[in-house]
């Protein structure tokens, strides 16, 4: 992968390299040794990961080069669009394999990181599905990744528990739990704690490989009714990337001796190029697919990134870029039509609100916003939706149940053939709205706070009554970068000033003072707010836009992470 050069052998501590771990030839573990971790990182599991890495690394490298080539085209004025070469796939009649009975009903799904208490609460939440996240809701330090694998194994085994010493309460699984999906990292992210043949492993192959190796048999027996495990696949930009996943699944099934098509996955459509590839993505995964999901926050981030060299496509304040914008509604409608035509789920987007326990009026206002958003989704034809907090499950469930009745989904009842005429212009239409100083301030304040939390090991962060993950920081970063690069006028609040480095510097200074007031001096001093501020500011003011904030930040947690947390 093209992004791996920064994680060279000289850049990582050699202390304890593979010490204590029984590793196969060509595999080197750079994370600290732990007896519990060693049970996950046994020789057989590492052989499985090494086989996946060696089999698919050249395909992955080629796909990442294709991403860079597409970026060059867009930066030279090109636009993403439907591929004429695959028109036959879009136009012909075919369907994906039938949806497994275990996941026919997905009307509300909850998401969260692979932390022990979170897993128990999410599985007990009353949602139909829990998506356990190794990606945007997790800071991928060594402890988080390995403990996440241990937690998931215990969850699949049914033995997971958690003793909250502060509340003196023990958490255990209920008799009835949500179905478990797991989201590995995207293709672009390395796993720099594990080297295979002298280069960092591919992060998603480590996440997928360890989880599948240790859990496929128990999962199929206890959760999947003969199917599974189930996955969510993030950040893809082209069907060639889905084809790699399909090949990974087939190889894993063959090595495990289970039936082809057992593994099932939902793909997040969260990049602008992927919206033109939805039929092709489903086609590549047709034996392993259980639908597509509207990853709307990352989709907005991708819109800015794709059009970084297009000054005629500037975004308004990000709070104005909702699902009522024409390009967002078109994306949602086409996703529903595509999925239902191919016989799989069309999943709606995230409700990120957190219950406001100390303000009932504000809480009801927030819940009403959630209900309206979910009503729009179910009436449009979505088969289910996402929530970030257990407190939102009843409201979301009520809306979907009231409109779907006893049907587990709307795959056959909401064809959305009216969306067949949506054009490239519909999907690329510039969003409307104003740009304000408050928009610039909010981006800066939220971006710095999220990054500070990420650097200290937290990937899902409550900020201003919303559960934020990496997507929020990415939108904030790229929008600030876009406004700075093109010197946009803040036309929405009567100020009429243009964004430049001097103005941005003042905003950063003032927002850091506000953050210190809000979190308190002691927490501010102990946290990594200053480091996060430097990194976020550098990213916003760089002459060229980095593809992912987390790639830059990952370099920091692998090499410089506090010793008591990472033990590198």
Curated annotation (Swiss-Prot):
UniProt-listed Gene3D superfamilies: Malate synthase, domain 3, Malate synthase, domain III
Catalytic activity: glyoxylate + acetyl-CoA + H2O = (S)-malate + CoA + H(+)
Compartment(s) where it occurs, according to its Swiss-Prot or TrEMBL record: Glyoxysome
Region of interest: Disordered: 1-20
Catalytic residue positions: 183, 469
GO molecular-function terms, A-Z: malate synthase activity
Recorded family membership: Belongs to the malate synthase family.
Identification of the protein by name: Malate synthase, glyoxysomal
Record organism: Cucumis sativus
């Amino acid at each position: 992968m093209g992004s791996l050069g920064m994680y060279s052998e000289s850049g990582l501590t050699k202390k304890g390299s593979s010490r204590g771990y029984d590793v196969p030839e060509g595999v080197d573990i750079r994370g600290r040794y732990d007896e519990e971790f060693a049970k996950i990182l046994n020789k057989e599991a590492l052989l499985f990961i090494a086989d996946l890495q060696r089999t698919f690394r050249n395909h992955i490298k080629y796909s990442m080069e294709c991403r860079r080539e597409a970026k060059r085209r867009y930066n030279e004025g090109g636009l993403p669009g439907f591929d004429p070469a695959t028109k036959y796939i879009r136009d012909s009649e075919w369907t994906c394999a039938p949806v497994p009975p275990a996941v026919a009903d997905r009307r509300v799904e909850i998401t969260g990181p692979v932390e022990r208490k979170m897993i128990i609460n999410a599985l007990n939440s009353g949602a139909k599905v829990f998506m356990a996240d190794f990606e945007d809701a997790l800071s991928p330090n060594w402890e988080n990744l390995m403990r996440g694998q241990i937690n998931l194994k215990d969850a699949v085994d049914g033995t997971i528990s958690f003793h909250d010493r502060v509340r003196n309460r023990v958490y255990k699984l209920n008799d009835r739990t949500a179905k478990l999906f797991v989201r590995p990292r995207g293709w672009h992210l390395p796993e720099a704690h594990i080297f295979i043949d002298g280069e960092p492993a591919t992060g998603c192959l480590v996440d997928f490989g360890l989880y599948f190796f240790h859990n496929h048999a128990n999962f199929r027996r206890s959760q999947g009714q003969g199917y599974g495990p189930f996955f969510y696949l993030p950040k893809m930009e082209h069907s060639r990337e889905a084809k790699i996943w399909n090949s990974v699944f087939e190889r894993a099934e063959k090595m495990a001796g289970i039936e082809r098509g057992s593994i099932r996955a939902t793909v997040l459509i969260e990049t602008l190029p992927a919206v033109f590839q939805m039929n092709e993505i489903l086609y590549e995964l047709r034996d392993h697919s259980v639908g597509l999901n509207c990853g709307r926050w990352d989709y907005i981030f991708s819109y800015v990134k794709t059009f970084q060299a297009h000054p005629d496509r500037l975004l308004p304040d990000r709070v104005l870029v909702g699902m009522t914008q024409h390009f967002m509604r078109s994306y949602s409608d086409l996703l529903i039509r595509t999925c239902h035509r191919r016989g799989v789920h069309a999943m709606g987007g995230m409700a990120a609100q957190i219950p406001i326990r100390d303000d009932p009026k504000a809480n009801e206002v927030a819940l009403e916003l959630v209900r309206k958003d979910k009503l729009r989704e179910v009436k449009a034809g979505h088969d289910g939706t996402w929530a970030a907090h257990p407190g939102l499950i009843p409201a979301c469930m009520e809306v979907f149940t009231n409109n779907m009745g006893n049907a587990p989904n709307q795959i056959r009842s909401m064809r959305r053939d009216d969306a067949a005429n949506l054009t490239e212009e519909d999907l690329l239409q510039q969003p409307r709205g104003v740009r304000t100083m408050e928009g610039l301030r909010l981006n800066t304040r939220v971006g710095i706070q999220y990054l500070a939390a990420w650097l200290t090991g937290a990937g899902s962060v409550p900020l201003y009554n919303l559960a934020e993950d990496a997507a929020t920081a990415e939108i904030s970063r790229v929008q600030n970068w876009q406004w700075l690069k093109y010197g946009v006028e803040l036309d929405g609040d009567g100020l009429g000033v243009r964004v430049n480095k001097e103005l941005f510097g003042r905003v950063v200074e003032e927002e850091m003072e506000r953050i210190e007031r809000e979190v308190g001096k002691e927490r501010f001093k102990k946290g990594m707010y200053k480091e996060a501020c430097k990194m976020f500011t550098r990213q916003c003011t760089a002459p060229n836009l980095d593809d992912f904030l987390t790639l830059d930040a990952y370099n920091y947690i692998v090499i410089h992470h506090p010793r008591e947390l990472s033990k590198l």
